[in-house]
Amino acid sequence: MVKISVIGAGNVGSTTVQRLAELEPGEIVMTDIVEGMPQGKALDLMQAGAINGYDTRITGTNDYADIANSDLVIITAGIARKPGMSREDLIKTNSKIIGDVAGNIAKYAPNSIVINVTNPLDIITYVAMKATGFDPEKVFGMSGVLDAGRFASFIAEELKCSKRDVEAMVIGGHGDLMVPLPQYTTVSGIPLPELLPEKTIDRLVERTVNGGAEIVELLKQGSAFYAPSAAIVRMAEAVIKDSRRVLPASAYLEGQYGQKGIYFGVPVKLGANGIEEILELKLEDSQCEILKKSSETIRKGISKLEI
């Protein structure tokens, strides 16, 4: 039986628990600092199991001790973006929150794999790794799966085809300098540049980069949670099933892509040990330049941390 703990019972956390419960991993613990919220949502989700047909045990708690012996811990805690805010605006507040969260993960679930979802994603994942003291391959961030999903959705909409036929790839930082890769994006195996003109692809790339902000502006309060939770569960499933799926993730680089000592979105193999392998792709010069700028932004953010 697999035990999964989700830290943060807000929209992303609770929706993730719902999707995970339907996979029937065994046990899920949802924890939050707000008294009553994780307990109430857990009770609601347990009752949904009688209707949707899953027997997953779901516990809501305010006590970190309840995450003890978790196989997988998913961090969704922290404040969300508001209109006009960038992911980088969240550095100071969320780094303190996640530093505390990570310390409790190290204390109660020292053998777990950790997926971070809190923004600014690449910087906060670095905080989580440092604060837990875990090996870097056991701590990684959810970024590219979500960004690639948005890219794929826009492509399917443009081509009027099934989303199931689109396989997209997005790398780089989870922010304004992410790098969608049309040359590694296919529709039923057909490279995207064979199906759409360059100007159209550029437009879809731009919308992908601004995909999260577009939703924030429309919602006025809060940020996306349905697509992020779907992306989290895709990654979690690869870990708990040891399927070694090739997915983009924010991984700790030690020389790959010319970067060292930072977290960065790259294609990886995900399995029971976390990041089993980092895959390096040949990139165009313009894409390499954006990646360089993205890495500089991440390094600048890390330099502001007090860890």
UniProtKB/Swiss-Prot annotation:
Active site: 174 (proton acceptor)
Main enzyme class: oxidoreductase
Keywords: NAD, Oxidoreductase, Tricarboxylic acid cycle
Binding site for substrate: 81, 87, 119, 150
UniProt-annotated binding residues for NAD(+): 8-13, 32, 94, 117-119
The reaction(s) this protein catalyses: (S)-malate + NAD(+) = oxaloacetate + NADH + H(+)
GO molecular function: L-lactate dehydrogenase activity; L-malate dehydrogenase (NAD+) activity
EC numbers, comma separated: 1.1.1.37
Single GO biological process annotation from the record: tricarboxylic acid cycle
Family from the record: Belongs to the LDH/MDH superfamily.
Role summary: Catalyzes the reversible oxidation of malate to oxaloacetate.
Name by which UniProt lists this protein: Malate dehydrogenase
Gene behind this protein: mdh
